[in-house]
Amino acid sequence: MLNVLFVCSQNRLRSPTAEQLFADWPGIETASAGLNHDAEVPLGPELVEWAGLIVVMETRHREKLRKRFKAQLREQQIVCLNIPDDYDFMDPELIQLLRQKVPQFLPDIAEAR
């Protein structure tokens, strides 16, 4: 089972959309968090350690993640989607972008069954 963590700034729009969108993907568990201290679910060391794959929305998220959680980052793959903070929660355009960009990093559906 691959633990996939989706990260944005506030954990209000992009990362929870991704978490919900891929929650039923075979072979993975999903979670989401935000890097800002006032995020809905603030990112903590436990979530970073839990994750096998960390998917960030912007390059600044990757840099913050690497600085703040240096001790917890070991073998995790960190992927940046380059999706700006221009979308609402479950925005159809955001969903389309996520469907285009994320599956290449997830276990193949056929292999997971």
Regions found by a protein language model. Give the residues of each.
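Short polar/charged helix/loop
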Residues: 1-113
